[in-house]
Every structure is written in structure tokens, then in C-alpha cells.
């Protein structure tokens, strides 16, 4: 079993009187893609923001066996990267310059920074936009650009890296949805990264994730493999939706279909 590199214990959160997360315990392992799933308002993005520190808290959260609050920001930035659901940037940077921002924690020359940024821009299919102004890009192009930025940020992390992605496919077309999740899976399998990704598409999650964590009304109701997690009974409980689960005709993962 792979090493636990990110853990959260007894995580609870309220917004006013509303319970958003209710006593969540979660372990994230190196070399695996873990997908956080659930309906709107289930607590997926809030949990991810707590795990990465975007929402400050005193919860028992540890990276590589060391409590989150004991990490120096300069050190954690080399090992832990977060791609938020929305990235607000209005200054007219070149697209390439936005990706180069990911290299700020690294000790690189300007030439090395540009070379690295272009490498990840090629992976995310935004190389042709390198000299374009960031505000002129579409939502999907910006999303792929920021994926290149966080991949750049983790370039020097060795095998101690945690990549967190909050709905990274929400603005993408079909081909780029798959390419984004292939990049995430490749990081897990070839670089031993621990990848945590918030998704809505159960079939994408089933195809690319090793583990599915299902949230419902702020509670963790399942943490298991796709085959064990995606049962019609559990899907109906979590999503109030009747479904049929079948095996993909050529690949070994379950697919979810409407029951009627």
C-alpha cells in the first residue's frame, strides 16, 4: 500500500448554522489519484480548500507526517500546489508569464524558467498561446494555462509532491478533459505524486482515479475503488438519481448510465 502523504482528521466546518463538513477523516496516498465526488453543496471544494490551507483552520491536517501549520510557506510551495476552481487575474500578462509565475518558489534562471514553462504549456496544449495576453483567452484556455502553472511549481519537488485540482475540467471540451486527467494520472504514476481532484463527472472519475471519495450533506459516505464505490444504490443515496452501472466495453472501469 502506498505511503500516506496527506491526512485530515475530524474535519468539521460550519458556514453560519449550516454544517458544510461533518467529522471528515481522509488519507491521501502517494502514487494515487483520489477524486472527491458529490452533488452541489456536498462540501467537496470546501474540503479541498481546508486540506491545502486556502481556508485557514486549526484542524489536524498533515503533509508528509508534519502538521500543516509547521510548514514554512516557501517550503510547502515546492511540494504542494493547488489549482483553484476560479483564478482571478486581470493584469495583461502574457500567457507564458502566467505559467512562469509557478517557478517563483524554484531556484531557476530566467532562461530555465521560460524553458520549463513552455514544456508544461506544450503538455497542456497552450503552447500556441504563449505570447497571447491572458485576459484575451477563453475560460478553457485559462484553465489549461493554470494547470501548466501548478505543474511548473512542483517541478523540483522530487517524489514528495501533492497536487490538488478543484474542478479542473469544468470549462474544457471533451478532448482537453481527458488530457487534463491524463496529466494528473501521469503525475501520480510516474512521479509518485498524490493527486486530489474535485470532479462532477462520475465516468471521468471512474476512468482516471484510483479512489473515489463520495460526500453527501457534508459527510463522507464512501472511500473506495471505483468498482466498489459506484453502485446504483449508493449513487441513488448520494445523488437522488436512479442509474445503471456497467463495465466499459474496452477498458476496465465502471460506467454510470441513466436508468430510464
Name what the model sees in each region.
Residues 6-8, 20-23:
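Conserved structural motif at the start of ABC-family nucleotide-binding domains
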Residues 37-39:
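The feature captures the beta-strand-to-loop junction immediately N-terminal to the Walker
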Residues 52:
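Helix-to-loop junction immediately C-terminal to a conserved catalytic motif
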Residues 59-69:
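Conserved ABC transporter NBD signature motif
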Residues 112-129, 151:
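Conserved ABC ATPase "signature" region
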Residues 133-137, 141:
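Conserved ABC ATPase signature
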Residues 160-167:
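Catalytic Walker B motif of ABC-type/P-loop ATPase nucleotide-binding domains
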Residues 231-232, 236-260:
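ABC ATPase nucleotide-binding domains
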Amino acid at each position: 500500500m502506498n505511503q500516506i502523504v496527506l491526512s485530515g482528521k475530524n474535519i468539521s466546518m460550519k458556514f453560519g448554522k449550516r454544517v458544510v463538513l461533518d467529522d471528515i477523516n481522509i488519507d491521501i496516498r502517494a502514487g494515487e489519484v483520489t477524486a472527491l465526488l458529490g452533488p452541489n453543496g456536498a462540501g467537496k471544494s470546501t474540503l479541498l480548500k481546508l486540506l491545502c490551507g486556502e481556508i485557514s483552520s486549526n484542524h489536524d491536517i498533515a503533509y508528509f507526517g508534519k502538521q500543516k501549520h509547521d510548514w514554512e510557506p516557501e517550503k510547502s510551495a515546492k511540494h504542494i500546489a493547488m489549482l483553484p476552481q476560479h483564478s482571478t487575474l486581470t493584469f495583461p500578462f502574457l500567457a507564458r508569464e502566467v505559467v512562469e509565475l509557478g517557478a517563483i518558489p524554484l531556484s531557476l534562471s530566467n532562461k530555465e524558467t521560460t524553458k520549463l514553462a513552455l514544456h508544461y504549456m506544450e503538455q497542456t496544449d497552450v503552447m500556441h498561446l504563449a505570447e497571447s495576453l491572458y485576459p484575451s483567452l477563453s475560460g478553457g484556455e485559462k484553465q489549461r494555462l493554470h494547470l501548466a502553472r501548478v505543474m511548473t511549481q512542483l517541478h523540483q519537488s522530487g517524489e514528495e509532491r501533492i497536487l490538488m485540482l478543484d474542478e479542473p475540467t469544468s470549462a474544457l471540451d471533451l478532448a482537453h478533459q481527458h488530457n487534463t486527467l491524463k496529466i494528473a494520472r501521469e503525475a501520480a504514476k510516474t512521479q509518485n505524486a498524490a493527486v486530489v481532484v474535485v470532479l462532477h463527472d462520475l465516468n471521468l472519475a471512474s476512468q482516471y482515479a484510483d479512489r473515489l471519495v463520495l460526500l453527501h450533506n457534508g459527510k463522507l459516505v464512501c472511500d473506495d475503488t471505483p468498482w466498489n464505490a459506484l453502485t446504483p444504490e449508493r449513487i441513488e443515496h448520494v445523488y437522488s438519481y436512479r442509474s445503471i452501472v456497467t463495465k466499459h466495453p474496452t477498458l476496465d472501469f465502471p460506467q454510470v448510465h441513466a436508468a430510464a
